[in-house]
Regions:
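Catalytic domains of carbohydrate-active enzymes, especially glycoside hydrolases
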Residues: 58-85, 187-190, 289, 295
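Substrate-binding cleft of secreted/luminal carbohydrate-active enzymes
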Residues: 284-310, 326-404
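Active-site-adjacent "subsite" loops/lids of carbohydrate-active enzymes
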Residues: 34, 42, 46-58, 129, ...
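Pro/Thr/Ser/Gly-rich low-complexity, intrinsically disordered linker/stalk tracts
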Residues: 383-384, 388-439, 494-506
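Active-site neighborhood of glycoside hydrolase catalytic domains
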Residues: 172-180, 186-195, 199-273, 277-303, ...
Length: 506
């Protein structure tokens, strides 16, 4: 019986890999040199509650190791789910999603955000601190710490369907959230600040947002209540991005909105052929305004539906976002479990992963993918992780450029040389000097080409590693085969320097 099960497992995996290769070839999938490959690691579902410090660190380290093997190069780590903190904060209380009790510090003490920054950077990954801006209490939180903003300033929150929401119509709430963001940006070496889809609450039939008083007092001359709500969120997004870049220009500010901007209907031309909740009309989030005005540095619409969904077809939506949200880098939020669950419409023996990745490759303004959620990829649901590491994300990828922040390439590496050491044959180089943050070298890219092969740095299959180290161990065999190694520098915005070549016999 066990033997038969193992044979079935092997056959199923082989079939999936065959489907991946078939679809990739048939739909024109090619590896990308620059691609954002992210994953969300959330706390809000309680996956860490009850874990000791050691157990949580082991769990996170294992997830990061597996995601690194899958080719992931960025992590969105949730550090603020309900005006709380998974980091040391003098502004907000420790999260119950960390210790089980809001306001209780972890024992033995540690700072999860600082630890994750170190662990991600060690693995060559970016770390984006993920915050929920307005939610002050989730449905299942029954007790708030006295330090919590809803306890200290109850008039600044409103209840809605079991939630507490920081009222977006109050300037002091906007300033408060930005104060929290500034504190993180100042004290931590993060690569980005990330905010998800929760702005005004998702609408519930029969419930009204209780903001009559705030609208009457602070309408700013806006006669339409919906426009006023959008104005409140717009001002927050604009001011938050400006505050981040004043402190650290290289810290990226991004959002992951709900997957539908607006449903197309008479009077709404810039809408998709969908029938669902809308950012603009229901959540009061004018995402296209933020993108087109440059108030955010990247956008990750959450396209969690399948191809062929009757109300929110994935193909329709990814093509819509590709068309309308190209003013800033566009990454697509993917639901791993749903993608693995649904069969491809044209090839029912395969799930929808190959078809979706083919769309990513074909659409010119799609610059990356973010996986919802990390653990699903780590658990290899539907062999999703296997397909990433063996096919789609097999080769390392640089981050997409952000020339609106910095477009100047750094200086190339210096003193590239190969040396025999007690640890083997090592390729060494040194970091060039820098006078300013946008000149500073942050990482290096190492390429390898065989003898006679054209040096083409646009070919990602030639990337050996992307590293912050100033050396690379060479795979010496017998010294009979000739290669050309190429080393380049990267700055914080992934601008790439000129190349330095070194011919070697391995």
């Amino acid at each position: 019986m066990t033997k038969n099960l193992n044979l079935r497992k092997v056959f199923f995996l082989a079939l999936l890999m065959f489907c991946a290769n078939l679809f990739a070839a048939g739909n024109g999938y090619t590896p990308q040199k620059r691609e954002f490959r992210g994953a969300w690691i959330q706390c809000v579902n309680g996956q860490f509650i009850g874990m000791s410090t050691q157990k949580m660190q082991q769990t996170l380290a294992y997830q990061l190791d597996e995601l690194q093997k899958d080719g992931v190069n960025a992590i969105f780590f949730q550090v603020r789910a309900e005006c709380d903190a998974l980091y040391k904060s003098d502004i907000e209380p420790w999260s119950r999603f960390l210790t089980g009790v809001q306001g209780k510090a972890p024992q033995p003490y540690w700072d999860p955000l600082q630890w994750m920054i170190e662990q991600c950077h060690k693995r060559g990954m970016e770390l984006h601190a993920w915050l929920n801006p307005y939610r002050a209490k989730t449905k299942f939180t029954s007790t708030l710490d006295p330090k919590h903003v809803a306890m200290k300033h109850p008039s600044r929150v409103f209840p809605y369907d079991g939630l507490f929401i920081l009222n977006p119509g109050l300037r002091e709430n906007r300033e408060y959230i930005i104060k929290v963001v500034d504190d993180i940006v100042e004290r931590y070496d993060i690569d980005g600040i990330h905010m998800d889809d929760y702005f005004y609450p998702y609408p519930v039939a029969g419930l009204q947002i209780p903001d009559d008083r705030e609208y009457a007092a602070n309408s700013n001359g806006i006669s339409n209540r919906d426009d006023w709500r959008r104005y409140n969120v717009n001002v927050f997004i604009k001011e938050c991005g400006e505050a981040i870049h004043r402190l650290k220009p290289w810290v990226k500010f991004g959002v992951s909105p709900f997957g539908i901007y607006r449903n197309k209907r008479p009077g709404v031309e810039v809408g998709s052929l969908t029938k669902g909740t809308q950012n603009y009309d229901d959540l009061y989030a004018d995402v296209l305004l933020w993108v087109n005005n440059g108030w955010v540095d990247y956008c990750v619409p959450q396209l969690y539906w399948q191809i062929g969904h009757s109300a929110a077809d994935y193909k329709t939506l990814i093509e819509w976002w590709n068309r309308y949200a190209s003013a800033r880098p566009l990454y697509i939020g993917e639901d791993v479990e749903r993608t693995a669950k649904f069969a491809d419409l044209d090839n029912p023996n395969c799930n929808q992963m190959p078809a979706k990745f083919a769309l990513h490759s074909q659409l010119p303004n799609v610059n990356g993918t973010v996986l919802w959620y990390a653990k699903a990829a780590v658990d290899n649901v539907g062999n999703y992780g296997t397909m990433l590491r063996n096919k789609y994300w097999r080769y390392p990828a640089l981050q997409p450029r952000m020339p609106f922040i910095d477009s100047k390439a750094p200086k190339k590496p210096k003193k590239v040389k190969s040396v025999w050491t007690c640890d083997g044959y090592i390729l060494f180089w040194t970091k060039p000097n820098a006078k300013h943050w946008d000149d500073e070298v942050y990482k290096f890219v190492v390429y390898r080409f065989e003898k006679g092969e054209k040096i083409n740095l646009d070919d990602p299959t030639k990337i050996v590693t992307i590293t912050d180290k100033e050396y690379h161990k060479l795979p010496y065999v017998d010294g009979k085969k000739r290669y050309t190694y190429v080393v380049t520098s990267l700055d914080r915005m992934s601008n790439e320097s000129k190349a330095v070549k070194k011919k070697l016999k391995l």
